Amino acid sequence: ASSKEIAEAIGIDSATVRRDFSYFGELGRRGFGYNVKELMDFFADILNDTSITNVMLVGVGNMGRALLHYRFHERNKMKIVMAFEADDNPAVGTTDENIPIHAISEIKERISEANSQTAILTVPSVKAQEVTDILVEAGVKGILSFSPVNLSVPKDVVVQYVDLTSELQTLLYFMRKG
């Protein structure tokens, strides 16, 4: 990425990017720009941020399976370490992408093994609150929810919603506008 591209992405001018990066030595090459992966690795080392965050996936339907196949750890510092599904689901007891799929009723026992307080929720809307309650009771403190319902959680639990319909509508709006 060029210094101009980096500057636009973070809202500063390109001269500031070049000057600030120069304090750390030669991070880029004139005319070629910066290798973003190398920059991220470089700054992660400086900030001592080399740890990987373990994440659990709850719901192994179509969306869940797609996320199991996504290589989070290759692009950033996150890794899905285990998945959970309804107790009677045939996927329970199997693995996908070397990720074990457990019964949701086992989450309390498995959460310490996962070494995670973060879950991705991809369950049907009608089950979202029930499953969220189970996650919270098991000690989960952060939930990325793909279910289009507002979840009720205690104040110490953070929920981030991914609403694909809203994102698509926003995209279409800007396509028509531009």
UniProtKB/Swiss-Prot annotation:
Its main location: cytoplasm. The keyword Transcription regulation applies. One of its GO terms (cellular component) is cytoplasm. It comes from the Bacteria. GO terms for biological process: negative regulation of DNA-templated transcription; response to redox state. Keywords: Cytoplasm, DNA-binding, NAD, Repressor, Transcription, Transcription regulation. InterPro entries: CoA-bd, NAD(P)-bd_dom_sf, Tscrpt_rep_Rex, WH-like_DNA-bd_sf, WH_DNA-bd_sf. Pfam families: CoA_binding. It is found in: Cytoplasm. Gene3D superfamilies: NAD(P)-binding Rossmann-like Domain, Winged helix-like DNA-binding domain superfamily/Winged helix DNA-binding domain. NAD(+) binds at residues 59-64. The keyword Transcription applies. GO terms for molecular function: DNA binding. SMART domains: CoA_binding. Modulates transcription in response to changes in cellular NADH/NAD(+) redox state. Homodimer. Belongs to the transcriptional regulatory Rex family. This is Redox-sensing transcriptional repressor Rex. It comes from Streptococcus suis. The lineage of its organism: Bacteria, Bacillati, Bacillota, Bacilli, Lactobacillales.
